[in-house]
Amino acid sequence: ALPIYMLQREYEQAAAGITQPSTRAVRAALKCFTTKRLRDTLLAALLDEPQAGLQFAEHVMRAGPTSWPGMRAQLTATVAVLAHATGQPGLAGVAAHRATEIGPDENFPSLVAKLTDIGQGERMVELVREGAEKTRTILFAE
């Protein structure tokens, strides 16, 4: 596993790109999506500014490797969460279903799709935010 300071640095580089997207930030965000811990930490930052976060997540998705369905599914599910957070349930529904098509065995996309289907998008955003903020706090407490 990477040393904690390297994880923190990847997160900080990615988070800095949410409002000022750059190649470096997109690259760091892609690295964040390779580990659940960093993905969740970055989710907290994306949800801090959901509108900019949604645009940034779409940048990252376009840059993501098409040959890595697990990562693509996670990114697509993230877009669904951010779409809910910005009051776009239509986009959220499309993204949630696409995520489960891309990665049918991935837990996060599956949860996002289930909660979207039963009309619990807002509740899901709260749950994701709570978990993500806890993960971010722990990452920086070490």
Region roles according to the model:
Residues 1-142:
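Charged, compositionally biased boundary regions
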